[in-house]
C-alpha cells in the first residue's frame, strides 16, 4: 500500500496514526515511554530522546539511568521522570574488593556478551538492578535502549539482560547508539524479535552489516544499492525494522521500504539522533494504538505498514524541525534548538488533530 507513494501522500497517510486527545482518555494513554541509558559522562543523549518523545506527544516520559547521571538529567527538566537504577563498576554500593573490581573492568567484550558466563556480573544485576528496572517496564508501552549507555562492563551486561527482559514482556523496543554496538558484536541479541527497531547511522550500519557478512561501502550513494543492503540486513535480522539514517532516511522491514527525502539541517550535531529516536518511540506507540482501535478509529493499514509509516512520520517531524532550527541558528545550531521547533514542525505537517475522531 505504501510503495511508490510520494512524500506528500505518505505525510497525508500518516495523519491517521496521530492519536487524538479525547476527553475520555486518561493520563498515559497517549504513551508511556522509557529511555534506558545515561551515565556519568553522557547525560544529554537520554535527555534528548525522552524530551523529544514528550514534545511530540507522549503523556509520560521516563529515563532509567546510572546513578551518577540521575541528578544531572533531573536538572535539565522537571517534566521527565528519572530513575537512577543502573550501576557501573565505580558504584560504591557494589561492595566488591579491589581484585574483583579490577578483573571485571578488564573483562574482554566477548565474555560480557555471553549470556550467563559471568556469575559476579549476573548476581549484581539480578539483586541490585533488574528488579527495579522490571518493575517499571511492567508499566511501559515502548522502550528505547542505548542513548548514553557507555561501555562499562556492568552497564553493557545490564543492557543485554534488560533487552532479554523486554522480549519476555513482549514490548516494542528501539535500539540506538551504544546498544547498536552490542548488535554489531552479537546480532542474535535482537534478531528475530518482531517488535524491534534499530536506528543505525552510516558507521553503525556498516558494523552491523559486517557482522552479518554483508559488504557495505561507506562511499556508496546509489539509491538502489543502499535499499538492497538495508533489505538484506533487515532479513538477516529476522525482518525487523531497520531505520538507516543518512542524507535520506531509509526505513526498511524485509522487502518493504520507505525513503524520507524531506530537507533537514545542513549541520550534524550530537544529539539529533537521540531526538529522532524519541520521536519514533511516540509515533510507533501511536501506530500500535491505531491498530488496537484505541480511539474507535478505522484501520486501513496492517501492523507492518503502520509501524513503517510511524517511523516516516517521526523522521519528517525531526527533519522539518532541524531545518527550521538551522535556518535560524546556522552554524551555531544545537540539538536543543531543534527541540524548540518540534511542536511547530508537528502541527505544520499533521495539523493539531486534538479532537479528531475520523481518519481524515
UniProtKB/Swiss-Prot annotation:
The keyword Transferase does not apply. It is found in: Cytoplasm. (6S)-NADPHX binds at residues 148, 201-207, 274. Belongs to the NnrD/CARKD family. NCBIfam families: yjeF_cterm. Catalyzes the dehydration of the S-form of NAD(P)HX at the expense of ATP, which is converted to ADP. Together with NAD(P)HX epimerase, which catalyzes the epimerization of the S- and R-forms, the enzyme allows the repair of both epimers of NAD(P)HX, a damaged form of NAD(P)H that is a result of enzymatic or heat-dependent hydration. This is ATP-dependent (S)-NAD(P)H-hydrate dehydratase. The lineage of its organism: Eukaryota, Fungi, Dikarya, Ascomycota, Saccharomycotina.
